[in-house]
Amino acid sequence: ADLLAALKLDAQTMMAAILHDVMEDTPNTKDEITSRFGSDVAELVDGVSKLDQIQFRSRAEAQAESFRKMLLAMVRDIRVIMVKLADRTHNMRTLGAMPPAKRRTIARETLEIYAPIANRLGMHSIKRELEDLALKTLEPVAYRDLAERVAARREHRESVLKRLEE
């Protein structure tokens, strides 16, 4: 929800972000969500739940099928995709508790499916974070090397800027 708040999205989207797992993890139904939070929130929660139910037999199928289903969902309401991207970002931030094989699978899926969608939607900060977190999981040595080089260049840029300001 923090990511979506930073994007200054409406209250219904924020509520849907908080409630996005309710239909999957509790006995609450779409009708109950509608009666308590309104049809807009219920439709968003239902849309995210439907995306979560997609099952794939192969990575190629996953990419094609996910793009197709997400694009269809976007036609109805782009906020469904925004909630899903925020959820995936949160999941990537908290991968540590999962077994290594599961972490790698989720990281690959994130890199191949969700980061490109974030990019296409112009959500570049989310795209960058998803890519960083996926690389950190899939290629930890390369990630550390890259992070060190970026940090070194940042220090150099900051010192140049400081000299220019003086």
Residue ranges of predicted features:
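Active-site helical microenvironments for divalent-metal-assisted chemistry
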Residues: 1-166
